[in-house]
Swiss-Prot record:
Protein name: Dehydration-responsive element-binding protein 2C
GO biological process, one term: positive regulation of DNA-templated transcription
Biological role: Probable transcriptional activator that binds to the DNA sequence 5'-[AG]CCGAC-3' of the cis-acting dehydration-responsive element (DRE).
Subcellular location field: Nucleus
Region (Disordered): 1-31, 122-149
Signals that turn on the gene: Not induced by high-salt and drought stresses.
GO MF, one annotated term: transcription cis-regulatory region binding
GN (gene name): DREB2C
Lineage: Eukaryota, Viridiplantae, Streptophyta, Embryophyta, Tracheophyta
Record keywords, A-Z: Activator, DNA-binding, Nucleus, Stress response, Transcription, Transcription regulation
Positions of the DNA-binding region: 54-111
């Protein structure tokens, strides 16, 4: 009976010791934080544009410089890629290191730039002339040539009309002149036969040709003659 009591006490003591050890170990154990990006763990740190940077593996220092880092495959160690003046330069350095380490599985920052750089230049496709297009071109060229010929002919006709009037136009003009009313129709046939000497005597002995030379003298002489006759 004494042996059973001693064994029971020893078992209870062992259980208590194990419980105490578990409590002490739970107090000393620390919970590991979940793996997050560096920017999430360092929220509030870094440069003013660090949180707005969209590039992977790129962060900004407090003094404004940009740094690039990348993790090695199957390892947690980070490789330092350098310090850069702009986030774009740091992203390019990260992309080049990612291609070297991960190959086709690399997650790149500049996908569009890599796609445009790797795409071959588009070759110029030669235009194939179809029968319809050939006929259209020939019709257009023939119509243009015909219009030019018509324009040239019209210009030549205009020149001939202005420089060399036709005989029919002359006949029409003569017919028009003969149909005009004459002086005899108005009883003025005597005025056409008045000689120049009669006109000179009527003017006081002054010729009508002197009127164009000194009209003032002619007017004075005419006034004197009129006064004497009155």
């Amino acid at each position: 009976m004494e042996m059973d009591i001693g064994e029971g006490e020893s078992c209870c003591g062992r259980r208590k010791q194990q419980q105490q050890q578990n409590i002490s170990s739970s107090k000393s154990r620390k919970c590991c934080p979940l793996r997050r990006s560096r920017k999430g763990c360092m929220k509030g740190k870094g440069g003013p544009e660090n949180q707005r940077c969209p590039f992977r593996g790129v962060r900004q220092r407090t003094w404004g410089k940009w740094v690039a880092e990348i993790r090695e495959p199957n390892r947690g160690a980070r490789l330092w890629l350098g310090t850069f003046n702009t986030a774009l330069d740091a992203a390019r350095a990260y992309d080049s290191a990612a291609r070297a380490l991960y190959g086709d599985c690399a997650r790149l920052n500049l996908l569009l730039a890599a796609a445009t750089a790797g795409a071959p230049p588009a070759a110029a496709t030669p235009s194939v002339a179809t029968p319809c297009s050939t006929n259209d071109d020939s019709n257009n060229s023939s119509s243009t040539t015909h219009q030019q010929q018509l324009t040239t002919m019209l210009q030549l006709d205009d020149d001939n009309y202005t420089l060399q009037p036709s005989s029919s136009d002359q006949e029409d003009f003569e017919t028009y002149v003969t149909r005009l009313p004459k002086a005899e129709d108005f009883g003025l046939e005597g005025f056409q036969e008045v000689p120049l000497d009669v006109l000179d005597e009527a003017g006081g002995g002054i010729s009508i040709w002197d009127l164009s030379i000194c009209p003032a003298d002619f007017m004075a002489t005419a006034a004197t003659t009129t006064a004497k006759s009155s």
